[in-house]
Amino acid sequence: MAFIALGINHKTASVAVRERVAFTPEQMVEALQQLCRLTTSREAAILSTCNRSELYLEIDHPTADDVLAWLADYHRLTLDELRACAYVHQDEDAVRHMMRVASGLDSMVLGEPQILGQMKSAYAVAREAGTVGPLLGRLFQATFSTAKTVRTDTAIGENPVSVAFAAVSLAKQIFSDLHRSQALLIGAGETITLVARHLFEQGVKRIVVANRTLERASLLAEQFGAHAVLLSEIPEELANSDIVISSTASQLPILGKGAVERALKQRKHKPMFMVDIAVPRDIEPEVGELDDVYLYSVDDLHEVVAENLKSRQGAAQAAEELVGSGVTEFMQRLRELAAVDVLRAYRQQAERLRDDELGKAQRQLANGADPAEVLAQLARGLTNKLLHAPSVQMKKMSAEGRIDALALAQELFALDEGAPRH
């Protein structure tokens, strides 16, 4: 049995690679079931965000070569392409990695809170797919507990900083006064919700939310006094938009160079600020070639993010220590679990011996035997039967010269005297 955490993230792979290895929500259940069917993975969960795609596994051997091969094949990459940017963590390192990820310590934005919710969603989907069992389930629960402790006991989450916040901060650098700016937000998920909140708090003049379903767009728009439209209405909204921020789960670009070019002509080449947070990308990279367009991808936000992280660096060490404690506690409990089956079998054996002796004593009492003598025989019989198998095995080990095993038996039975002598 081994735990494995493997994948790619913003530190090891470009956005061009990450979008190729991303899983859509629609793919997730089928992918999980295929992963467990075609590899040695006994339990599995997949976390796929704009910054990382990771697989968390419980497998029956300590290598993940077949899983890497499956991941490359699933996303139509060569194995060499994937190996060039993939990482593999095993057992204690895998546990530590999961806890660091959930705590926001491995994020582009140190301490960002969204990743914990995303990991909880990954766990829920894996449960729906039937690919999470008792071991991986325990690891997820321990991970959530540690991440909660980090969040409540350190300042890692203070001074809100996220990719969404970084995008709005960058917009403020382009348009110093957002009160006169109009924003078009594409998508209606968690990241776009955060963007909308930050823009609303900055007093942006007008927000339009475009989404595949009008119902979802309207639910988000209502929170911030925004206007909701369908994706098909984006071309009409572009000309009025100073700020365009997109984050959907679409597998194909939503905005192309031609549509933006036409909008710029209507705007008389007034600057347009665009941030594509999606992986795969929502906005064709060629849009960035247009004059008067400031197009940023999620990778371009690194510099803005770094500037906003200084206040959280001091809390990072305390958070790492809490993660270390969480890892130690989980690994100890995991080792204790290894004894559960043995203890259960030992107890069942002892209970069978007890029942045999108790039945014999009850029959003797029913036949009129002296109760005191029956009790004495019960005690002697139970003692002899409980000691018989261990006694036979210890004599055998002694005859074989296995002094270390005898010393272990003394520790196991908490004996104070009679230690074997070398």
From Swiss-Prot:
The keyword NADP applies. Substrate binds at T49, C50, N51, R52, S107, E112, P113, Q114, Q118. Pathway: Porphyrin-containing compound metabolism; protoporphyrin-IX biosynthesis; 5-aminolevulinate from L-glutamyl-tRNA(Glu): step 1/2. One of its GO terms (biological process) is protoporphyrinogen IX biosynthetic process from glutamate. The active site is at C50. GO terms for molecular function: glutamyl-tRNA reductase activity; NADP binding. NADP(+) binds at G187, A188, G189, E190, T191, I192. Keywords: NADP, Oxidoreductase, Porphyrin biosynthesis. Homodimer. Catalyzes the NADPH-dependent reduction of glutamyl-tRNA(Glu) to glutamate 1-semialdehyde (GSA). This is Glutamyl-tRNA reductase. It comes from Pseudomonas paraeruginosa (strain DSM 24068 / PA7) (Pseudomonas aeruginosa (strain PA7)).
